[in-house]
Amino acid sequence: MSAVKRTMLLCLALLLALWSAVCGETVSLPESLGVNASQGTVQDHWDGHGAMGDGTEYWEIAFSPEDAAEFEESLQTALGWHALPLDNDVRYLLYGTEGIEKAQDGAYISVNPYLTGKDGSPLFPRIEEGYWFFCDEQTESYTAQGVRERPSQNFTAAVYDSQSRTLYCGELDT
């Protein structure tokens, strides 16, 4: 009887090991990005959403030189993607202002970033060469105009660094 129990326990252990190997965590980017980044390697991912669904989620995905060329080509025709530099509305949401700045309407403003990391600093590094993406999930549009004036913000933003071949993506739900 004990040999049967041992055999069953061994089979159960093997089954659990196989199941955990097959059913590992998969990280999927927001569908609103409209691009396939599955050929990249996830360098970092965390989800800070709470029980009510508010919070921030972050992805960092690196690409090989070959895959980066194909990925960059897809960004050129995907909805919501633009070559850098960022427009001012998106820049304010992602990085805030550096001290007090004169806005386009002539007013002086100081804005903290909305999309921040766990330490409160901007979630994305500053990038000189690449592409950016923004999708306002509340209006289902690819513009950041008016987002800061709302009592809640729900958006997905991403920047792709052509030099390091890295995609940074973040989602904010408030």
Model-derived regions, located:
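Gram-positive cell-envelope targeting signals
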Residues: 1-26
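Sparse, context-dependent recognition of short Cys/His-centered cofactor- or disulfide-binding micro-motifs
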Residues: 3, 8, 44-46, 143, ...
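Extended hydrophobic/Leu-rich segments
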Residues: 8-10, 16, 75, 109, ...
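Short, well-ordered helical secondary-structure segments
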Residues: 10, 48-50, 147
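N-terminal export/targeting and maturation segments
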Residues: 19-88
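Functional cores of ribonucleases/endoribonucleases
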Residues: 82-166
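Conserved beta-strand-loop-alpha-helix junction that forms the acyl-donor binding cleft
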Residues: 170
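Short, solvent-exposed mixed-charge patches
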Residues: 173-174
